[in-house]
Amino acid sequence: LNIEFWICGICNSDDYKIELKNKVRTDNVIFDFRFINNGEIPSLLSKVDIVLIPYNVESSLNSGVAILAFSYAKTVISTEIGTVLDFLDSGMVYVYNNSQNDELKNTLCSIYDEIQKDSHFLEVKGSGMLEYVRKHNNVDFIKKELAKVYL
């Protein structure tokens, strides 16, 4: 199985860029430390199978990136932020606690094992999540759910 990891997006500091690069001891990690324009997102998402969102849970609640990844039928692994936790009952997203070092590694290994058993595993997960989002973010569905709470 040929795996590449892409680390994309703006870094807060040059020190953080250097720290990330120093931690990598393999040639299959690609760094792209720049702002990703909206026009580039479809092309970038078409090249990946999984979107890993390692947000700081103390400063992030929601993620447009997660919703966008779901919209492109991509499997998402994320820290425990509100957006992703809202979709946890779908059984199609992966959530990890970023204070537990082995939790992300274990999640990645678990996904790798599933891919070994079924090469279409990620497509099935991604497509399932896309359908889940379409159903649960449907205007009529949301109206009904809000009516249950407020009426």
Segments predicted by a language model, with ranges:
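Short alpha-helical donor nucleotide-sugar binding micro-motif in glycosyltransferases
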Residues: 43-48
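Nucleotide-activated donor-binding/catalytic signature segment of Leloir-type glycosyltransferases, i.e.
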Residues: 9, 17-42
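Acidic, amphipathic alpha-helical patches
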Residues: 38-41, 65, 84, 104
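Nucleotide-sugar-dependent
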Residues: 53-67, 80-81, 85-86
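Short hydrophobic beta-strand element within catalytic cores of glycosyltransferases
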Residues: 75-78
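Short alpha-helix at the nucleotide-sugar/activated-sugar donor binding site of glycosyltransferases
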Residues: 69-71
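A charged, aromatic-enriched C-terminal amphipathic alpha-helix characteristic of glycosyltransferases
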Residues: 99, 116-150
